[in-house]
């Protein structure tokens, strides 16, 4: 499974801002516990590169990428430190071309027909749409998907736990990005259980997962309770009872 497929399967791409690289592994493990195995660590802080390296070296199940990449220098450093994909807020031909030439997955920000055509010219099929709330959200992406049917979007900015399902349901959406599943304040405070819960909620909302009734066939009550607890851990469908 390639990077693009991993992002689509995850549905939600956490945008992670870390002030201290020592929190990187714990944040990654919290995301994994919530069913999310991709993360975008942004170059908004000086800890970005070291955070990427820490996750790449200690969390083999996590696909870690670099976000807010605005220069070629940042791009090269991110890849050197272990980033498997690059996300940029806008379209910079130098950054995108370097990634394409070096086999690095890249998702540049594209909100206009001109930017989308530039991305397509370099062989891209998935672009970032940022900030989605400012540039028209779903209606704008739907309009752009008319002439650019081969392009899919990863909107960021304006996506949250309440509307993620609406975004994911649109055929032109590849995945969504956002920081609401891993708030910077919760990372700094060590509230990693909350981050895990937010990821589970986001995944359930993205998948449109609802439960009316579950029938569990087990040999005894103890086994059935264990199964129910596992389902609750995965989907937060309610505390299991005998």
PLM-predicted stretches and their roles:
Residues 1-82, 101, 161, 169, ...:
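Conserved N-terminal beta1-alpha1 strand-loop-helix module at the mouth
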Residues 3-17, 203-228, 234-235:
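N-terminal beta-strand motif that seeds the catalytic metal site of vicinal oxygen chelate
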Residues 17-22, 66-72, 88-92, 108-113, ...:
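Glycine-rich beta-to-alpha transition loops that act as phosphate-gripper elements at the mouths
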Residues 31, 167, 227-232:
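Conserved active-site tyrosine of GNAT-family acetyltransferases
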Residues 32-37, 58-62, 80-86, 101-107, ...:
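Glycine-enriched alpha-helix->loop->beta-strand junction motifs that scaffold or abut catalytic
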Residues 36-41, 74, 79-84, 101-103, ...:
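Glycine/Thr-rich beta-alpha phosphate-binding loop at enzyme active sites
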Residues 89-95, 128-138, 172-194:
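Glycine-rich phosphate-binding active-site loops on the catalytic face of alpha/beta enzymes
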Residues 240-242:
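Conserved small/polar residues in nucleotide/adenosyl-binding loops
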């Amino acid at each position: 499974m390639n990077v693009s497929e991993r992002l689509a399967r995850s549905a939600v791409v956490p945008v992670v801002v870390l002030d201290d690289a020592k929190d990187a592994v714990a944040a990654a493990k919290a995301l994994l516990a919530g069913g999310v195995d991709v993360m975008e660590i942004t170059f908004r802080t000086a800890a970005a590169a070291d955070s990427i390296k820490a996750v790449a070296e200690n969390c083999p199940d996590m696909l870690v990428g670099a976000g807010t990449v605005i220069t070629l220098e940042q791009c090269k450093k991110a890849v050197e430190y272990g980033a498997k994909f690059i996300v940029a807020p806008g379209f910079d031909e130098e950054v995108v071309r370097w990634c394409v030439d070096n086999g690095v997955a890249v998702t540049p920000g594209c909100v206009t027909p001109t930017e989308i055509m530039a991305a397509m010219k370099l062989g891209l099929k998935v672009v970032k749409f940022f900030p989605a709330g400012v540039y028209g959200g779903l209606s704008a992406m739907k309009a752009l998907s008319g002439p650019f049917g081969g392009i899919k979007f990863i909107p960021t900015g304006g996506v949250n736990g309440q509307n993620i399902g609406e975004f994911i349901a649109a055929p032109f959406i590849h995945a969504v990005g956002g920081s609401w599943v891993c708030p910077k304040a919760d990372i700094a405070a060590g509230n990693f259980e909350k981050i895990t819960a937010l990821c589970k909620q986001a995944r359930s909302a993205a998948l449109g997962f609802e439960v009316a009734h579950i029938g569990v066939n087990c040999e005894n009550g103890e086994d059935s309770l264990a199964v129910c607890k596992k389902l609750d851990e995965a989907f937060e469908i309610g505390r299991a009872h005998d």
